[in-house]
């Protein structure tokens, strides 16, 4: 992947000793000494709670690695070459950019408050119909995940899809500095991370960083929301909008695990319900058309997309009498309301139960947001409300539902669900920190 000349020039490294390396030998970057060998360069990353430098001395003693990066001159590299850099993470990102530029795939950056992972997966399913496509694994959406994604690229990749997350300003800016996307997608700007950023305006600024450092054709495909459009500061960017209220969109039907809609006179099907999932699909359609896919290829890609990873997974129990919609990957006030609305649109006139937990990172107004959600529930008739967590108790208090229960313990709630609810439909949703996946773990389907 890299010869010694490239390693030094790209990272602006300085040799700490005179250990000789064959100029023609190539090395692969590794950040983990547990799986390292002679063909690897060890690059120790430094984080808030870890420092890869603490493993260097053990690696020197117990491995045959020939090249080490470091930000510290103290190490004695007797039988290996030490390369000194100011910042090992910066060196990691520079090497990733260099390798990406050699392959030169069309690069697509995806961000948003909600739906970015789903959109990335839809894009991958669509664009793979025509191109050799690579994507960020799961939700490895920070700068380290970006570099790991790049180093897993194969030379024949034509399109790269990079998901970009953030918990504050300038975090996406750091990733796009090295990613240089040709296309950027913003799914939406909602209340996720409002506790950290303080306002929706700041969230929009952070998300719109995905339009920085773009390469031609410098095209942003974004939700038609004024707060997004106002925060795209580069006026040379070609902006294309998508809108769930577009006159070009006609939602034909939604039922369990199926949505059918028409967009720009073409019919599309998804194996998942929810207006917000149709909205996610619109950005994939728009980019597919730009990249010369036919409507049929796009339709095939969308139909092949499958829900994944605690994102609206429909699970059946008790001989199909009990349906649990597992949407517990994460939650904020907007995604909660959208999921609840979809749940009641799909599952009508049956015994419906909501199991809701704490929503995190909402800042000083966290109690208000939870009470507002409880009041929102008063728009619907349903059987039982179950809440878990000290914040979710405020949902319970604000709800006027006659049947409501609050638990402080996941196992108690799990036992109640499977002991008391034998049929009907259950939606489970909470922030990732609540670990709601444990509510269905180990239960026979």
What residue spans do the PLM features occupy?
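Mobile, glycine- and charge-enriched loop segments
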Residues: 38-43, 133-134, 144, 148-160, ...
């Amino acid at each position: 992947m890299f010869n010694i000349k490239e390693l030094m020039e790209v990272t602006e490294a300085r040799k700490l000793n005179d250990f000789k390396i064959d100029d023609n030998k190539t090395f692969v970057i590794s950040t983990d000494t547990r799986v390292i060998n002679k063909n690897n360069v060890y690059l120790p990353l430094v984080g808030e709670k870890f420092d890869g430098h603490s493993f260097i001395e053990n690696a020197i003693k117990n491995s045959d690695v020939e090249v080490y990066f470091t930000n510290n001159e103290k190490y004695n590299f007797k039988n290996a070459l030490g390369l000194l850099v100011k910042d090992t993470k910066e060196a990691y990102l520079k090497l990733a950019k260099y390798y990406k530029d050699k392959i030169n795939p069309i690069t697509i950056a995806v961000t948003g408050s909600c739906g970015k992972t789903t959109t990335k997966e839809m894009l991958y399913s669509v664009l793979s119909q025509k191109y050799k496509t690579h994507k960020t694994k799961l939700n490895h959406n920070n700068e380290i995940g970006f570099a790991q994604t790049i180093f897993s690229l194969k030379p024949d990749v034509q399109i790269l899809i990079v998901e970009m997350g953030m918990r504050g300003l300038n975090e996406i800016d750091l990733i796009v500095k090295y990613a240089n996307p040709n296309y950027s997608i913003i799914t939406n700007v909602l209340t996720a991370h409002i506790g950290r950023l303080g306002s929706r305006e700041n969230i929009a600024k952070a998300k719109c960083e995905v339009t920085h450092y773009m390469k031609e054709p410098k095209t942003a495909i974004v939700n038609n929301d004024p707060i997004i459009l106002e925060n795209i500061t580069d006026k040379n960017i070609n902006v294309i909008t998508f809108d769930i209220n577009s006159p070009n969109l006609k939602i034909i039907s939604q039922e369990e695990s199926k949505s059918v809609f028409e967009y720009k006179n073409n019919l599309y099907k998804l194996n998942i319900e929810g207006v917000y999932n149709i909205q996610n699909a619109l950005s994939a359609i728009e980019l597919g058309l730009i990249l010369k896919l036919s409507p049929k290829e796009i339709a095939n890609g969308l139909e092949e997309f499958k829900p994944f990873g605690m994102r609206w997974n429909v699970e059946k129990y008790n001989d199909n009498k009990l349906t649990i919609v597992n949407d517990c990957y994460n939650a904020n006030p907007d995604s909660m309301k959208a999921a609840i609305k979809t749940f009641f649109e799909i599952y009508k006139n049956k015994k419906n139960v909501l199991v809701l937990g704490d929503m995190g990172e909402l800042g000083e107004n966290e109690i208000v947001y939870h009470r507002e959600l409880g009041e929102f529930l008063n728009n619907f008739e349903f059987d039982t409300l179950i809440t878990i967590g000290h914040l979710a108790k405020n949902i319970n208090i604000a709800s006027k539902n006659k049947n409501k229960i609050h638990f402080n313990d996941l196992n108690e709630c799990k036992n109640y669900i499977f002991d008391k609810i034998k049929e009907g439909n259950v939606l489970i949703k909470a922030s990732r920190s609540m670990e709601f996946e444990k509510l269905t773990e180990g239960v026979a389907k």
